[in-house]
């Protein structure tokens, strides 16, 4: 039996458990999907001690989980965020499927007329979105609660940047 789950801080709002339980049932897959709520990243070791096949990772651990992993896929390394952990041959391998999913979703709407993207947020998922935009040649501007770098602005600055956009 496969033991899979979602790793995050507050998971009551997540539909992942119900989605995967339904998927497993409809497809006759012998697996369990559990929510693994941890209040601090250091508690992850207790999750890893369980016999797990794979984990989805959500807020706020997509970046914080990386030091606890044995390997990263190339894309996860480039993005700097992990949303899937694969347990294989005794190793914990971090992957990022957010970038692929976002790229597949937005691809039909992009044209060569698009030059810039306004990205709200600077967390793990937004890093994957930024990776996609930059890989297709778009200039990315971030709006964040805590702007801390080049091309990062506060939500208070948003009106000014929208006018220039």
Residue ranges, per PLM feature:
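Glycine-rich adenosine-cofactor-binding loop
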Residues: 8, 94-99, 106, 114-136, ...
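Short amphipathic alpha-helical segments and helix-helix/interface helices
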Residues: 21, 45, 130, 159-162
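Rossmann-like adenosine-cofactor binding region
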Residues: 150-165
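NAD(P)-binding Rossmann-fold cofactor-contacting core
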Residues: 136-153
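Short, Lys/Arg-enriched, disordered terminal segments
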Residues: 1-2, 160
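Residues at the starts of beta-strands that form the adenosine-phosphate
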Residues: 3, 32, 116, 138-141
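Phosphate/diphosphate ligand-binding glycine-rich loop within oxidoreductases
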Residues: 2-109
């Amino acid at each position: 039996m496969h033991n899979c789950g979602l790793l995050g801080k507050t998971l009551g709002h997540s539909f992942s458990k119900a989605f995967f339980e339904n998927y497993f049932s409809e497809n006759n897959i012998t697996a369990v999907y559990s929510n693994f709520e941890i209040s601090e990243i250091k508690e992850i070791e207790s999750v890893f001690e369980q016999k797990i096949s794979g984990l989805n990772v959500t807020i706020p651990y997509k970046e914080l989980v990386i030091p606890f992993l044995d390997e990263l896929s190339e894309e996860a390394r480039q993005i700097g965020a992990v949303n899937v952990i694969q347990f294989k041959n005794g190793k914990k391998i971090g992957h990022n499927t957010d970038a692929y999913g976002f790229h597949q979703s937005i691809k039909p709407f992009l044209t060569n007329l698009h030059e810039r993207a306004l990205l709200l947020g600077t967390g793990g998922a937004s890093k994957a979105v930024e990776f996609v935009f930059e890989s297709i040649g778009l200039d990315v501007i971030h709006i964040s609660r805590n702007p801390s770098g080049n091309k990062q602005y506060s939500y208070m600055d948003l009106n000014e940047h929208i006018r220039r956009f």
